[in-house]
């Protein structure tokens, strides 16, 4: 409850840490077990802690307490009925998941961070079952594929290459949907990423294993499917509840620009399945044409 949350806000601990860290020249504050080795090694080697290490530990304390305060204000904001859509001061916090081998290009360093709030249905919640570590471009492209998948409440398979949809299939089964997605562009799908909101079974896995794919994401892989797909050493298999169509509460699109940050609402307007479109020509589309248009409308929104 709200009252329990308020009761659990720690006042003394952060105050003690901040006071000690302020006096870092004379006090060593170690809040992260990962730093124990560094401190012990210095003590063993010199009998003291260097000023360089003290200042590093000082920074770690204020980083930690700042994150703690940010999480409190985010919770309090989530409890407001009249919270401003775009607050005057925007404070966000993320936790590092992993450092990448490189970024978008080999000469760029990069890391992946996760939101500390609700991440259900998003990449940070995925469980990697097989394959190499995800790269910067892998994560970026897979996220784009998952955003397109959210448009569908029926069984669908999305194939993405270099951030762009190259195949989409909608059918009664994942196997049929994959066949349609593959046939949309058999050339571009090679080396691409495939995501689905249905279970990958043996029949689907057999089809998928015939070509080189970077990543496959699904809410579930059968044991038979895993036995087939894990024969490919470098293929990444991610298990994620892709049936979740709603974005986490309060999710916003943030885009860094030099000297600032652009923030906007998620574009989660889904085209109605009943085709709520006004035809302004004398020629009326057939039911099949309208069905195709509805599918194309969803896809083109995610084309770059």
Regions flagged by a language model, labelled:
Residues 68-70, 78-303:
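ATP-dependent carboxylate/acyl-activation modules
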Residues 1-80, 172-173, 198, 255:
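Active-site loop-to-helix "anion-binding N-cap" substructures in soluble metabolic enzymes
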